[in-house]
């Protein structure tokens, strides 16, 4: 089925300047410009995927394709990279827009707050205000999703899926206890080491290493994410990770309560970033919410082997909402 999806479903790659940062956007489906499309055939809804960290949108292409197919190819499925996590190839044109009245560069765009504003800036400039949205946040993308709802409550979001959501106590999680000293205290050692090892490395060697790594991880290589071994992108991912450990502490119950009717939380049973007790706590505090615990032992990084299972869950949950569109 994966090979069929790869052959039949169009995916359009763009590099844009958003908030002053190069950004990769992968658009699943035939629609590439929703903002200026005035035709009657323009879809009424966009499914928008916000990745975890590192925010390599190319990793989510198989998931986006599966979801596009399961929703009967009626709606575009777009995935955005995080600011600073993708650099355009030298032969690739970077698109700009003048539509945003708030088009100034975003302060600290590679940090936690800047990444949230980066996603909001993209929606302002590339998605019509009246277009309905389904937001899908993975890992720290779930935190971004909640913050987007908090900052712009008028966003026309009909559903938001928070997959393996790192929305609280990140530094206290099993992985967080390991990552915190590395990302917060030894970050500059990582920067220098990465730069010294990777900067002199020929592109052909990097490409070979990436291809082998993607094969091992079962990740599709349709859009080769060379940025995996780019020191600039790795440094930005580490910088964002350090802020996650320091700032993602308390769960935003006020925002969750306000938007609970449109939220679906999906927790893992074997997730070292948000352990089962986090699920039990939020389930206790919001018993009426759609808060689910995975029964299939799907790992936090579901994009390595479980794209179809996650797409099935989301498509099934959206059936009633999409039937009204």
Swiss-Prot record:
<dbReference type="GO" id="GO:0035356">
    <property type="term" value="P:intracellular triglyceride homeostasis"/>
</dbReference>
<keyword id="KW-0443">Lipid metabolism</keyword>
<protein>
    <recommendedName>
        <fullName>Lipid droplet-associated hydrolase</fullName>
        <ecNumber>3.1.1.13</ecNumber>
    </recommendedName>
</protein>
<dbReference type="GO" id="GO:0005811">
    <property type="term" value="C:lipid droplet"/>
</dbReference>
<comment type="similarity">
    <text>Belongs to the AB hydrolase superfamily. LDAH family.</text>
</comment>
<keyword id="KW-0378">Hydrolase</keyword>
<dbReference type="Pfam" id="PF10230">
    <property type="entry name" value="LIDHydrolase"/>
</dbReference>
<dbReference type="GO" id="GO:0004771">
    <property type="term" value="F:sterol ester esterase activity"/>
</dbReference>
<feature type="active site" description="Charge relay system">
    <location>
        <position position="300"/>
    </location>
</feature>
<dbReference type="GO" id="GO:0160077">
    <property type="term" value="P:lipid droplet fusion"/>
</dbReference>
<keyword id="KW-0256">Endoplasmic reticulum</keyword>
<feature type="active site" description="Nucleophile">
    <location>
        <position position="139"/>
    </location>
</feature>
<dbReference type="GO" id="GO:0019915">
    <property type="term" value="P:lipid storage"/>
</dbReference>
<dbReference type="GO" id="GO:0042632">
    <property type="term" value="P:cholesterol homeostasis"/>
</dbReference>
<keyword id="KW-0551">Lipid droplet</keyword>
<dbReference type="GO" id="GO:0016042">
    <property type="term" value="P:lipid catabolic process"/>
</dbReference>
<dbReference type="InterPro" id="IPR019363">
    <property type="entry name" value="LDAH"/>
</dbReference>
<comment type="function">
    <text>Probable serine lipid hydrolase associated with lipid droplets. Has low cholesterol esterase activity. Appears to lack triglyceride lipase activity. Involved in cholesterol and triglyceride homeostasis; has opposing effects, stimulating cellular triglyceride accumulation and cellular cholesterol release. Acts antagonistically with PNPLA2/ATGL in regulation of cellular lipid stores. May regulate triglyceride accumulation indirectly through stimulation of PNPLA2/ATGL ubiquitination and proteasomal degradation. Promotes microtubule-dependent lipid droplet fusion.</text>
</comment>
<dbReference type="GO" id="GO:0005783">
    <property type="term" value="C:endoplasmic reticulum"/>
</dbReference>
<feature type="active site" description="Charge relay system">
    <location>
        <position position="271"/>
    </location>
</feature>
<keyword id="KW-0442">Lipid degradation</keyword>
<dbReference type="InterPro" id="IPR029058">
    <property type="entry name" value="AB_hydrolase_fold"/>
</dbReference>
């Amino acid at each position: 089925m994966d090979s069929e999806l790869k052959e039949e479903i169009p995916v359009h790659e763009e590099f844009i300047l958003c908030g002053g940062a190069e950004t990769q956007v992968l658009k699943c489906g035939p629609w590439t410009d929703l903002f200026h499309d005035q035709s009657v055939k323009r879809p009424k809804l966009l499914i928008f995927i916000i990745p975890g960290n590192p925010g390599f949108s190319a990793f989510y292409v198989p998931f986006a394709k599966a979801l596009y197919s399961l929703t009967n190819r009626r709606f575009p499925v777009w995935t955005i990279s995080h600011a600073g996590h993708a650099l355009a190839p030298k032969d690739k044109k970077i698109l700009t827009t003048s539509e945003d009245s708030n088009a100034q560069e975003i302060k600290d765009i590679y940090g936690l707050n800047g990444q949230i504003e980066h996603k909001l800036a993209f929606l302002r400039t590339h998605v019509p205000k009246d277009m309905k949205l389904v937001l899908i946040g993975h890992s720290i993308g779930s935190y971004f999703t909640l913050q987007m709802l908090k900052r712009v409550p008028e966003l026309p979001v009909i559903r938001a899926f928070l997959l393996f959501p790192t929305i609280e106590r990140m530094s206290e999680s099993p992985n967080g206890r390991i990552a915190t000293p590395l990302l917060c205290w030894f970050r500059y050692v990582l920067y220098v080491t990465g730069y010294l090892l990777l900067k002199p490395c020929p592109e052909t060697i990097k490409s070979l290493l990436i291809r082998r790594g993607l094969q091992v991880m079962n990740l599709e290589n349709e859009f080769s994410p060379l940025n995996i071994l780019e020191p600039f992108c790795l440094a930005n991912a580490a910088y964002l990770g350090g802020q996650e450990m320091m700032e993602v502490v308390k769960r935003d119950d006020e925002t969750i309560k306000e938007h609970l009717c449109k939220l679906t939380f999906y927790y893992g049973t074997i997730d070292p970033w948000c352990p089962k007790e986090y699920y039990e706590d939020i389930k206790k505090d919001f018993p009426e919410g759609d808060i689910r615990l995975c029964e299939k032992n799907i790992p936090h990084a579901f994009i390595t082997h479980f794209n179809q299972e996650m797409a099935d869950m989301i498509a099934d949950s959206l059936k009633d909402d999409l039937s009204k569109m």
